[in-house]
Amino acid sequence: MKNYLLCAVLLFLAISCSTESDYEHSQNVDSKEIALRTSSQIPKNKTNPFDARGKEYLDLLTIYLKNNKVPNSINELTDRTQFLLKNYGEARFLSKINATFTAKQAALLMGFEKPLTDLIESCNVTPEVKHYLINFFQALLAQEGQEYDKLYNYIVSFETGILRSNTLKDDEKETILTVSSISTYALYIDPKHKDRDWEISVANRKVQPVFNSHRASIISVLAVVRTLF
């Protein structure tokens, strides 16, 4: 009888250890897969020497979204842009942390095309850089509603053209590539450009807001960019 009990106990322990080991292995595999899948989704262009500046912008957006939602109103857009102006500017250009962005400015930029162009024209950059940036942002605005992959491919193609340019100076290339990198990461976090799987997963939730988050993302970028140059 004692032998039977001993065998039963040993068998139970063996099964328990095996199950625990399999569970731990499964957990480790799942974690690795999730980490790999997440990292592969982060946009990056290794050929852009200023790509890290866009990643800094994404890191700030991620921090902001921990306690706030994606803007769905002029006031929320204003708050997010002010946060980015203060923190991105503070990290890079201490002399410009007093830059402000008002709800009135946000409303004008959301409603009309000319203020967007005027904002670029007011940047302290060369006419050549302004020309490239105006065309760049107009192209992005025209692609509202596109999935992120298409936006990303457009930006990478644009950056390739800038890098190969024989007419732009090095500092002009730096300015343009910094702006394009920030735009890459800003649009990545915009829920409007999530893939079809994401759309299906939220199909039973409330209808998406009419607030143009694509345009709002570009406006935040422009407001920050204006303080950098």
Model-identified regions with their sequence ranges:
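Acidic/polar, low-complexity intrinsically disordered N-terminal segments immediately downstream
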Residues: T19-E199
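Enrichment for repetitive, rod-forming helical segments
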Residues: V9-L10, F137, L222
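Alpha-helical transmembrane segments
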Residues: Y4-A8, R215
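Positively charged n-region of N-terminal signal peptides that target proteins for export
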Residues: M1-L5, S18-T19
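C-terminal motif of bacterial Sec signal peptides marking the signal peptidase cleavage site
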Residues: L13-S16
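Hydrophobic, gly/ala-rich membrane-insertion helices/peptides used by toxins and envelope proteins
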Residues: D190-F229
